[in-house]
């Protein structure tokens, strides 16, 4: 059965908007996905959804260098660097609203449920802070706070934030100290782990991460992007081992659903990996290395059948895959 992608994008894969800064993508190749493309391997095939994530007025939503979140209703929240802040789409890809109020530039997004209410945590890398806000965009918490204290290596370069099953919060300093900090739900520091390097207990860029529930105990799956590898840690930040084969094509982000991890490799493709770390499908794999990992590809050179720079990724509730590119 073919599932949908969106590229924001949606791979139902749903389609998404390519929004390369400095280029007008209002028309022509690369403006939006215009053709449904089947991609992937047998048993793990997806089809792009043309027109998903395109506002009715056809305007470019702005430059993207961030992530997505998906709420329980299936609405998709896409982080932008500009005026829209967080652009919100329903599950059909229709633009519904913007969340502004200082929410631009979220490098990562993750949803949390507290009682009967949903919130989103964002890693706001340019402001050196983590922000928790409700689904209307009202900020309800900011970290670090007075309980956090001094973080080894500082708050600069926060690229990812996760919330564990027990409510602990994890900061990933992928553009900064290359360390991971574990905090209590109230913001108090519990543990600091890692640092710059290529060996055990080190990262060249702990750029993205996801909670992995496929094993007896929950794990953290870290995208060591520039180390071209992925690493499993315990929830207490203890090294378990490298996940899958190396070198990878610079894994930028990961989201796990059921038996599979969906990985955004910034060098031109999305992959699905099983519990053993085997790649079972590659989606919209771009053979043109000159288009990998860049936001500078001219609009007329972008095509419906290939990614350029997948950066953020999330599963949808019905098995969709949503992708934002560095663009």
Could you describe each region identified by the protein language model?
Residues 35-62, 295-300:
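A short helix->beta-strand "capping" segment at the edge of beta-propeller domains
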Residues 84-86, 128-131, 178-180, 228-230, ...:
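Structural signal for beta-propeller blades
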Residues 58-73, 102-118, 148-168, 198-219, ...:
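Beta-rich, blade/repeat-based domains predominating
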Residues 47-53, 96-101, 140-147, 190-195, ...:
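Beta-propeller fold detector
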């Amino acid at each position: 059965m073919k599932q949908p992608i969106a590229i924001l994008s949606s791979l139902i894969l749903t389609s998404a908007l390519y929004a390369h800064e400095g280029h007008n993508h209002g028309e022509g190749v690369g403006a939006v996905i215009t053709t449904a493309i089947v991609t992937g391997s047998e048993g793990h095939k997806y089809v792009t959804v043309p027109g998903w994530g395109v506002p009715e007025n056809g305007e470019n939503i702005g430059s993207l260098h961030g992530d997505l979140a998906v709420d329980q209703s299936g609405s998709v929240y896409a982080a932008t660097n500009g005026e829209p802040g967080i652009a919100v789409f329903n599950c059909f890809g229709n633009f519904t609203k913007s969340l502004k109020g200082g929410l631009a530039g979220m490098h990562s997004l993750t949803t949390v449920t507290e009682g009967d209410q949903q919130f989103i945590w964002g890693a706001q890398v340019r402001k050196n802070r983590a922000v928790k806000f409700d689904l209307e965009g009202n900020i309800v918490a900011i970290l670090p706070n007075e309980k956090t204290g001094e973080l080894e290596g500082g708050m600069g370069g926060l690229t990812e934030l996760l919330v564990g099953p027990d409510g602990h919060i994890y900061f990933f300093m992928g553009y900064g100290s290359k360390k991971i900090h574990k905090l209590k739900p109230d913001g108090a520091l519990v543990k600091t782990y890692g640092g710059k390097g290529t060996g055990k207990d080190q990262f060249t860029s702990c750029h993205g991460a996801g909670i992995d529930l496929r094993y007896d105990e929950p794990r953290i799956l870290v995208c060591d992007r520039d180390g071209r590898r992925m690493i499993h840690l315990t929830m207490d930040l203890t090294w378990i081992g490298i996940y899958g084969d190396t070198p990878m094509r610079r894994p930028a982000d990961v989201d796990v659903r059921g038996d599979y991890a969906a990985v955004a490799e910034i060098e031109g493709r999305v992959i699905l990996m099983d519990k053993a770390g085997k790649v079972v499908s590659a989606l919209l794999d771009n053979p043109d290395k000159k288009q990998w990992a860049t936001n500078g590809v001219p609009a007329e050179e972008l095509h419906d059948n290939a990614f350029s720079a997948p950066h953020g990724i999330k599963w949808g509730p019905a098995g969709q895959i949503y992708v934002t590119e560095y663009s």
